[in-house]
Amino acid sequence: MYSQIKNTKGEKLYIFTIVNTNSIKPYIYVNTWEKCLKKFEECTKELDNDSFFAQIIHKNISEETHTAEASMRCNNKGWGCDYFSYITINSLYTEA
C-alpha cells in the first residue's frame, strides 16, 4: 500500500521536476501543491528577448488530480541550437 508523503505540518508533498534535452542533471523541487504550482507558472512563461527564447508547446494543469505537465522549446540566443524542457508536478508517495 502506498500513501502520500506529508511534511511536519501535515500538508501533502509534491515533486516538481524540470528535465532539459541539453542537460543531464534534472532540477527537482519538493514542496506543497500551491508552492510547486507557483514555481510551475514561473517556469512556463513564454519569453522572447535579446538573450533567451521560450515557447510553450504543451501545458496541462489538473487541479482535480494535482498534476501538471508542460513541454517548452527554448534557446539561449547566440549559444547554439534549440533544446526542449519537460516540466512536471506529481504526488510524492512512499510505501507504507
PLM regions with names:
Residues 2, 45-96:
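Short, mixed-charge low-complexity intrinsically disordered segments
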Residues 4-24:
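Short aromatic-glycine-(Arg/Gly/Cys) micro-motifs in beta-strand/loop hairpins
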Residues 6-12, 35-38, 77, 95:
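Intrinsically disordered, low-complexity polyampholyte segments enriched for Lys and acidic residues
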Residues 22-35:
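A short, exposed loop/beta-hairpin motif centered on an aromatic-Gly-Thr core
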Residues 34-37, 41-44, 57-58:
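Residue-level detector of alpha-helical secondary structure
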